[in-house]
Design a protein with these regions (language model features):
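Short glycine- and acidic-rich boundary segments immediately preceding or forming the N-terminal edge
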Residues: 1-42
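Active-site-proximal beta-strand/loop segments in catalytic clefts of secreted hydrolases
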Residues: 34-36, 59, 106-111
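Short, solvent-exposed polar/charged micro-motifs at secondary-structure junctions
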Residues: 39-45, 114-118
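Short beta-strand-to-loop junctions in surface cap/lid or active-site-entrance loops
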Residues: 44-52, 60
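Active-site/substrate-binding loop(s) of hydrolase catalytic cores
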Residues: 52, 67, 74-76, 80-152
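Di-metal (Zn2+ and/or Mg2+/Mn2+) metal-binding site signature of metallo-dependent hydrolases
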Residues: 63-69
Length: 152
């Protein structure tokens, strides 16, 4: 199966583009508002299934763990394809598994932290002086949000 999600680092606009592509391919996938980051970047949440109470999957809690964003988006792509096609994942029929159940996916809880980890000080926007001071000169291992707060 060819994945919609490719091997591009998940900067905010790339995640937005993936979500648009996933939504176009899988119209049953819904986007719901979930808030904005310190720097105003949207925090995306996608849902599927029919239950009021949903199981929540969250990725990108720490900036330097941006790979988890890609893993969750890839999983969501495969899950949606299996749901659409009546397929299975790990031997479990996805449509049957979602009867009376719902899932919610937050592919990047900390978009500011991911931007800082991937783009350096440019990703910190107006908080660049603070990030520069807190990072000790190296943003590649940046974990926190744009205020320097660890989200877990």
């Amino acid at each position: 199966m060819q994945s919609i999600v490719t091997n591009h680092p998940p900067v905010h606009q790339t995640v937005r583009n993936y979500i648009n592509t996933l939504h176009a391919a899988y119209p049953f996938l819904e986007e719901m508002p979930s808030g904005r980051s310190v720097l105003g970047r949207e925090i995306f949440c996608l849902t599927m299934g029919h239950a009021k109470d949903k199981v929540l999957y969250v990725a990108g809690t720490h900036g330097s763990e941006w790979l988890t964003c890609m893993v969750l988006l890839r999983f969501l792509d495969r899950l949606c394809a299996a749901y659409r096609d009546g397929g299975a994942i790990a031997g479990v029929d996805v449509r049957t598994a979602l009867l009376g159940r719902g899932l919610a996916f937050v592919p990047c809880l900390n978009p500011d932290g991911v931007e800082i980890a991937l783009r350096g000080y440019d990703g910190a926007l107006r908080n660049e002086p603070l990030v520069r001071r807190l990072s000790g000169g190296d943003t590649r291992c940046w974990q926190a949000n744009a205020r320097g707060v660890d989200l877990n």
